[in-house]
């Protein structure tokens, strides 16, 4: 959410930043509501003061036996009391309307975010690794002979419908190994604190990180009102919801491996084959809670943590910075990591690493005490995939596939597979 004071002070700059997202100006509507709300508050305070004055004068009139004046003042007290209540109710309604409007406005891009409308305008900033030269036509993951026995879409469709998968045997073991490897790397080498949290959360938590109220259709809600998390960003970031933390406790760097659930609204017809786009999937998510000065540096650090996973696995990738028109709702700047998928012959997103500034913190009312004292300030938040486990599995299978239908597995996974190094053409680890 945005700071209304900053919008009052420089509405032109606010609208100019939104223009980088290709959005029309909204400051006139915001400031009009704000002015109406403030005028009601001022009028309510004036009416309350008149009520207090009349009440005091009524007491004096009663004391000197002036019954007529007492009755007049008592009626005035009642009228001002009713007026105060009416104005306060109007101010409360306007405040709710203003908050609703502010909650629907996305975060402002950082200076330097490239302008653009969509993914075609994103800017590559680096790449790592050379795509492998195959001496045969590489297949997509679900076409590889050794993968087919362990990737069962037919049974999944019987159980749950489209965009689900049942993993079996060696493929399931590799999937599990990837998640364990990612957690070990992030906790033991990158210094992130492993966290396990619920996958069902309250609406306030989804609002805190920006999924609600605008993007409710993208997630699943239970009859009881809980939401299934679309990412552990929701739970990890909201661990400081409503808190006032000490500066010395920052940065807080967390990582979680969880199930994630997305309705994929608006994705009809996209990636319908294979397990690239699923309603239920696993992800290792990184979140940092930091102060106002460290956010940009922390963003670079988190990006490197995600890149390290791909490098250890030997997977070619490129890092891009998203243009204003392609950034997510809560981000000020986003780095996407795209891994090379030889079966598709192109790079596909496998991680998004975003710096959100104090945007989420204002929604959560999450603050910290500055080390030198002074007024509490809002924390700054960051989140990033480290990585999406299913998509990493796809990349490992496609990049490691062999002409005979087997898959050569990355060396860093061997200890997690009991020393096994390959997925055979029969789907058995060997």
UniProtKB/Swiss-Prot annotation:
It comes from the Bacteria. One of its GO terms (molecular function) is serine-tRNA ligase activity. It catalyses: tRNA(Ser) + L-serine + ATP = L-seryl-tRNA(Ser) + AMP + diphosphate + H(+); tRNA(Sec) + L-serine + ATP = L-seryl-tRNA(Sec) + AMP + diphosphate + H(+). Keywords: Aminoacyl-tRNA synthetase, ATP-binding, Cytoplasm, Ligase, Nucleotide-binding, Protein biosynthesis. Its EC number is 6.1.1.11. L-serine binds at residues 231-233, 285, 385. Residues 47-66 are annotated as: Disordered. Pathway: Aminoacyl-tRNA biosynthesis; selenocysteinyl-tRNA(Sec) biosynthesis; L-seryl-tRNA(Sec) from L-serine and tRNA(Sec): step 1/1. Signal peptide: none annotated. InterPro entries: aa-tRNA-synt_IIb, aa-tRNA-synth_II, aa-tRNA-synth_II/BPL/LPL, Ser-tRNA-ligase_type_1, Ser-tRNA-synth_1_N, SerRS_1_N_sf, SerRS_core, tRNA-bd_arm. CDD domains: SerRS_core. It is an enzyme of class 6 (ligase). It holds the Pfam family Seryl_tRNA_N. PROSITE patterns: AA_TRNA_LIGASE_II. One of its GO terms (cellular component) is cytoplasm. It is found in: Cytoplasm. GO terms for biological process: selenocysteine biosynthetic process; seryl-tRNA aminoacylation. Catalyzes the attachment of serine to tRNA(Ser). Is also able to aminoacylate tRNA(Sec) with serine, to form the misacylated tRNA L-seryl-tRNA(Sec), which will be further converted into selenocysteinyl-tRNA(Sec). Consists of two distinct domains, a catalytic core and a N-terminal extension that is involved in tRNA binding. Belongs to the class-II aminoacyl-tRNA synthetase family. Type-1 seryl-tRNA synthetase subfamily. NCBIfam families: serS. Homodimer. The tRNA molecule binds across the dimer. HAMAP family: Ser_tRNA_synth_type1. This is Serine--tRNA ligase. The gene is serS.
